């Protein structure tokens, strides 16, 4: 990597705790480096994103406050319930109304963990990628593997 103009930033100890958030670490980092027009963060735990995904995200940024990589949720949240002991507590009205056919339930997406992009000044002002005119780039599931557990590592190894 010596031929690349890359500066490694080691996260301070207070940003390497269970309570610390990536967003807070990024905002603090922005205060320590030279200012740019935009700030983009690529999470190392989502290594299968490709250059075309990043280009698609960058192309949306001129018309947005921020751009976030997204992936389709395999299970719809509208079928979610809370369990209290053995009591089932439906969260959404559709379960009580018998509307459970997933073919007719709206699809939901979640951040894939691959990247977050935003305008520098906007991020410093709002400290949030989800405020304003937020755009999403849908990344296919095979490139949206967010590796956080040993099971995720095993799944990622199967993809290699």
What are these model-predicted stretches?
Residues 1-3, 127-128:
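Short loop/helix-cap segments at secondary-structure boundaries that form the rim of catalytic
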Residues 2, 35-36, 109-110, 138-140:
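Short hydrophobic "helix-edge" motifs at membrane interfaces and signal-peptide entry regions
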Residues 2-40, 48-52, 56:
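Short phosphate-binding loop-to-helix
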Residues 18-24, 47-132, 138:
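Conserved core of the sugar-phosphate nucleotidyltransferase
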Residues 31, 59, 158:
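Short, well-ordered alpha-helices that flank and scaffold nucleotide-derived cofactor binding pockets
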Residues 44:
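A short SAM/SAH-binding and catalytic strip from SAM-dependent methyltransferases
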Residues 65, 125-145, 150-160:
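Catalytic donor-sugar/metal-binding loop of nucleotide-sugar-dependent glycosyltransferases
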């Amino acid at each position: 990597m010596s031929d690349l103009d890359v500066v490694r930033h080691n996260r301070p100890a207070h940003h390497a705790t269970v309570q610390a958030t990536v967003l807070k670490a990024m905002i603090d980092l922005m205060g320590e480096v030279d200012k740019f027009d935009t700030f983009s963060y690529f999470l190392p735990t989502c290594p299968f994103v490709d250059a075309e995904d990043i280009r698609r995200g960058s192309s949306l940024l001129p018309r947005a406050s921020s751009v976030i990589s997204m992936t389709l949720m395999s299970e719809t949240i509208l079928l979610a319930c809370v369990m209290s002991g053995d009591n089932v507590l439906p969260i959404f009205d559709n379960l009580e109304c018998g509307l459970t056919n997933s073919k007719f339930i709206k699809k939901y997406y979640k951040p894939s963990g691959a990247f977050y992009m935003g305008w520098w000044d906007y991020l410093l002002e709002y400290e949030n990628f989800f405020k304003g005119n937020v755009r999403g780039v849908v990344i296919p599931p095979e490139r949206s593997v967010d590796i956080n557990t040993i099971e995720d590592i095993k799944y990622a190894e199967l993809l290699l």
